[in-house]
UniProtKB/Swiss-Prot annotation:
Its EC number is 1.2.4.1. Its cofactor is thiamine diphosphate. The lineage of its organism: Eukaryota, Viridiplantae, Streptophyta, Embryophyta, Tracheophyta. Thiamine diphosphate binds at residue 82. It comes from Pisum sativum. One of its GO terms (cellular component) is mitochondrial matrix. GO terms for biological process: pyruvate decarboxylation to acetyl-CoA. This is Pyruvate dehydrogenase E1 component subunit beta, mitochondrial. It is an enzyme of class 1 (oxidoreductase). It is found in: Mitochondrion matrix. Keywords: Metal-binding, Mitochondrion, Oxidoreductase, Potassium, Pyruvate, Thiamine pyrophosphate, Transit peptide. Tetramer of 2 alpha and 2 beta subunits. Pfam families: Transket_pyr, Transketolase_C. One of its GO terms (molecular function) is metal ion binding.
């Protein structure tokens, strides 16, 4: 099968971005789809595999149209066996191909953790750089509204702690398109964490983003909003929450700088610390568990590198330390909200926050 993939003749390809060239908005779903299309058209070694990525066009339609365009040799529907198809993907990467492996949810990646960690992540180091593993693991991560604990785990800090992996967390259409293209081109294994609730959201995109040559550097954060009073770091869905919080804070005289991390590993420590040295305050936001989280790592970096610049205690916002409830009213109680970010930023700026509200 791999020989067939390697020698497959690419069909003439339309440029995925042309469909959007006259538009100013693009959904995250379309951004991911177009990134896959452009990279598959440019490199015959790139192929997709996973549950329902072909005939069904992806559980969330991210791979729509790609089976028809590139054929079953490059868009492979797999059985429901994450350990099996992930192992095949890693083996294909050893062989020199560039698989993009989709998990219907990253909760299911636990079935394939041995291949992801012990094979993909460690092989380059253990071979003294002789073996590259150019593979992308992508799919849903975190809160997806009403799907329960076994479909809502946030794996950002989990995979972010593992040497040998790169971990990307897109928020906007620009992020999704540019980071996925970079991930596919990267010689190392990349974990690409998407959020279901962002798929249908539209974001403004420039002509540069729509160009087929566009990509984003891995490990570089983006300052989404400049400010002078407090730094707020966030990733994935939480970036939107942070921006909404910044708008509310502005009305109360607080200027918040919002950093979209984009990458968890490597983490853009210079951008974060430069911002904190300007604002002298820090609030980290994530939806994952509070212990050993991404926010904890960011706070540690700031304490180690910029402690003398801090005018207030660092603030961490995260999910509750419990598995995700199924009931909607309980789910709302364990995930962060805009008002949580606002209260934390006001505390950091020494503004009055009632004890009941701060609890």
């Amino acid at each position: 099968m791999l020989g067939v993939i390697r020698n497959k003749t690419i069909r003439p390809s339309f440029s995925a971005f042309r469909f959007f060239s006259s538009a100013k908005q693009m959904t995250v779903r379309d951004a991911l789809n177009s990134a896959l299309d452009v990279e598959m058209s440019a490199d015959s070694k790139v192929f997709l595999m996973g549950e329902e990525v072909g005939e069904y066009q992806g559980a969330y339609k991210v791979t729509k149209g790609l089976l028809e365009k590139y054929g079953p040799e490059r868009v492979l529907d797999t059985p429901i066996t994450e350990a099996g198809f992930t192992g095949i993907g890693v083996g294909a990467a050893y062989y020199g191909l560039k698989p993009v492996v989709e998990f219907m949810t990253f909760n299911f990646s636990m079935q394939a953790i041995d291949h992801i960690i012990n094979s993909a992540a460690k092989s380059n180091y253990m071979s003294a750089g002789q073996i590259s593993v150019p593979i992308v693991f992508r799919g849903l991560n975190g809160d997806a509204a009403g799907v329960g604990a076994q479909h809502s785990h946030c794996y950002a800090s989990w995979y972010g702690s593992c040497p040998g992996l790169k971990v990307l967390v897109p928020h906007s259409a620009e992020d999704a398109r540019g980071l996925l293209k970079a991930a596919i081109r990267d010689p190392d294994p990349v974990v690409f964490l998407e959020n279901e609730l962002l798929y249908g959201e539209s974001f403004p995109v420039s002509a540069e983003v729509l160009d087929s040559s566009f990509w984003l550097p891995i490990g570089k954060a983006k300052i989404e909003r400049e400010g002078k009073d407090v730094t707020i770091t966030a990733f994935s869905k939480m970036v939107g929450f942070a921006l909404k919080a910044a708008e509310i804070l502005e009305k109360e005289g607080i200027s918040a700088e919002v950093i979209n991390l984009r990458s968890i590993r490597p983490l853009d420590r210079p951008t974060i610390n430069a911002s904190v040295r300007k604002t002298n305050r820090l609030v980290t936001v994530e939806e994952g568990f509070p212990q050993h989280g991404v926010g904890a790592e960011i706070c540690t970096s700031v304490i180690e590198e910029s402690f003398g610049y801090l005018d207030a205690t660092v603030e961490r916002i995260g999910g509750a330390d419990v598995p995700m409830p199924y009931a909607g009213n309980l789910e709302r109680l364990v995930v962060p909200h805009v008002e949580d970010i606002v209260r934390a930023a006001k505390r950091a700026c020494h503004r009055s926050v009632p004890l009941a509200a701060a609890a």
